[in-house]
């Protein structure tokens, strides 16, 4: 039986899939740089692939790419794009990041972009990271990104940890999708750099390299990207 937070998350991302696709077309340069380093014979998994903005460039280079997402409607969008671009080496699976239906140590590289922070509960986030580690071959790498809590936009909400509600985790916040007439709350656990590294370490990754990226904030990082090794 699906947990309530998974059902809610699936509904949320199904509801905004078409609108999301309009505004998330450009791949992150950090991801393109990561893809450049992957062998053409690699089998790659894009966990929480969304609308495929990183999956498509990866598929154009690598042997096979598996895209997983909690949203069936996101997967439909990806499928339509692969057909349009005549890409035949992509395999799509409806799945959560916490329970990846792939065998141990079979994958050459993993992308997990802007999705870890959408998983409710620290235990579940760690579980998803451990799943990524499990499916990776030894010495293989993953790129993982999260939103930062200390941006110009969000930092005021988290300046005093003692004033934060004890009923929720420090960093938890609902951020609304308000485009195309929609007004839909999305769960986020916004990360600090230290916490991000600690979660990656707890999952068992090594050679953790974290980079902060600014988008709209002049002083503070908006995102953190980590390249990790199994």
Walk through the language-model features, giving the residues of each.
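A conserved beta-strand element that flanks and buttresses the S-adenosyl-L-methionine
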Residues: 111
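A short glycine-rich, Lys/Arg-flanked "PGG" loop and its adjoining helix->strand segment in the class I
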Residues: 126-138
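Conserved class I S-adenosyl-L-methionine
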Residues: 1-42, 57
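Short catalytic micro-motifs in class I SAM-dependent methyltransferases
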Residues: 114-118
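Core SAM-dependent methyltransferase catalytic element
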Residues: 216-230
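Class I SAM-dependent methyltransferase SAM/SAH-binding core
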Residues: 45, 51-99
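Conserved S-adenosyl-L-methionine
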Residues: 205-216
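SAM-dependent methyltransferase
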Residues: 143-199
């Amino acid at each position: 039986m699906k947990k309530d937070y998974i059902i809610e998350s699936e509904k949320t991302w199904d509801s905004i899939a078409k609108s999301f696709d309009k505004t998330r077309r450009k791949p992150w340069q950090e991801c393109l740089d990561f893809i450049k380093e992957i062998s053409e014979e690699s089998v790659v998994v894009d966990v929480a692939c969304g609308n495929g903005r990183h999956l498509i460039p990866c598929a154009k280079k690598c042997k096979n790419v598996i895209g997983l997402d909690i949203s069936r409607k996101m997967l439909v969008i990806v499928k339509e794009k692969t057909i349009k671009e005549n890409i035949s080496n992509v395999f799509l699976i409806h799945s959560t990041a916490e329970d990846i239906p792939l065998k141990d140590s079979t994958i050459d590289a993993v992308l997990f972009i802007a999705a870890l922070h959408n998983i409710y509960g620290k235990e579940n986030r760690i579980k998803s990271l451990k799943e990524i580690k499990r499916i990776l071959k030894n010495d293989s790498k993953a790129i993982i990104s999260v939103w930062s809590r200390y941006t110009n936009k969000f930092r005021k909400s988290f300046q005093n940890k003692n004033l934060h509600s004890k009923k929720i985790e420090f960093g938890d916040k609902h951020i609304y999708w308000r485009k195309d007439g929609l007004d839909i709350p999305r769960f986020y656990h916004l990360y600090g750099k230290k916490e991000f590294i600690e979660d990656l370490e707890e999952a068992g990754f090594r050679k953790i390299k974290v980079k902060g990226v600014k988008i709209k904030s002049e002083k503070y990082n908006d995102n953190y990207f980590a390249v990790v090794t199994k």
